[in-house]
Amino acid sequence: MTRALLVDPNFSSVPIGQALAQHGIDVATVGRKTSEGQYTNHFDIDYSDRAAMRALLQRERFDYLIPGCTDKSYESCSALAVDWGFPALDSPETFNQLYSKSKFRALCHALDVSVPRVFTSEQEALQSNAPVIIKPDDAHSGIGITRLDLPTTTTLSKAVKVAQDFSSSGRVVIEEYVHGQLHSYSAFLQDRQVHCAFHVAEYGTLNPFAVDTSYVLPTSSHELELKNCAEKIAHALALDCGLLHIQYLAKNSDICLIEATRRCPGDLYAMLVTRSTGFPYAAAFGAPFIAQPISKIESPKFHRYLIRHTVSRETFNLMGRDIFETGAAVEAWVPIANDLGEGVPDASRAGILLLPAANQADVMNVIAAIYGRGSALKQRIENRPSREER
């Protein structure tokens, strides 16, 4: 039987494993086991340990290597593919071109693709008199980020230090803060052209730099421009096939790209797209890694409004069943961790809510309710007793 190693055992990668199994492939997973794990054929190995991974591949002789929903997963697969020749995985150089914020911005600048203005020094940022945002060059998911509307020498230096602490390389990006609504453009490539793509509006209801709420848009006025951007990047980096997932800010007729990745987005993004459009997102993501063409996968068949909301453990514990009071019926509640006890960090996710909506206005009402609940949650967090007082 054909065998594949899925390099991510956590809940967001489950749809990928299920799609692979539908091809009759025997799927194993690798990674440090968590309470999210749902696989019996699992190797409890740190997949960032290249020596251990090489030993595993040498011993087990898998036919395919499949990245999951984390940057570290794709980075590990990229490095291993150099020696093992697994299909459709980017080289480490290509991975870094997208993963590094500074390299990605330089690439986009060379391709005449709009990205935020990058400052070469703290002094240049201060002299610009513009609002700035400071980010680790090689960390994602909203960590280590500071926004300064009126930066000073002191506040900017402090923000740079925070970003450096979250960067494995110690590098940071200081750029002009761009106002706009966050979106993702999730494009599947075949022969360096966009076969099909999805537009998703994204919100951070608790942390403005970390997405926890999103829904698929039926159309976008930026479709042609984004397609052009994606294909420019695909040709420049020789991305023949597979996913190119872009996050961008939109304001009126303007767009500004923020980052791009080739991994599958997490928090059941694949499920959101599939339930909203009928398109088998997880199957399309996995197809190139098992040498199957994306072009044979049918395009979306319909559109329905469905909101995805990620609930943290802290929210779950403080709000209880109030998390379901958003003004919408609950289509699905997908718990992430089997154990929500004291051993699970507050920042970890308790589960994913899927909330159907009748139309665009209904979507915005539900999201407003989620934002309102977030304000109530913040009050509860601020007013709750400290651990010493409990």
Question: Language-model segments: what does each one mean?
Answer:
Residues 1-94, 295, 358-385, 389:
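ATP-binding N-terminal substructure of ATP-dependent carboxylate-amine bond-forming enzymes
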Residues 4-7, 26-32, 118-120, 132-133, ...:
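Short, hydrophobic beta-strand segments that form beta-sheet elements in well-ordered domains
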Residues 82-151:
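A conserved helix-loop-beta module that forms one wall/lid of the active-site cleft
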Residues 110, 286-390:
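Peripheral (often C-terminal) accessory segments that flank ATP-dependent C-N-forming ligase machineries
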Residues 114-116, 133-134, 145-180, 199, ...:
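Conserved ATP-binding module of the ATP-grasp superfamily
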Residues 145-151, 188-190, 216-217, 355:
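Short beta-strand-to-turn element immediately C-terminal to the catalytic PLP-Schiff-base lysine
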Residues 176-239, 243, 250, 261-289:
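ATP-dependent carboxylate/phosphate-activation module, predominantly the ATP-grasp catalytic core
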Residues 254-256:
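Conserved protein kinase catalytic/activation segment
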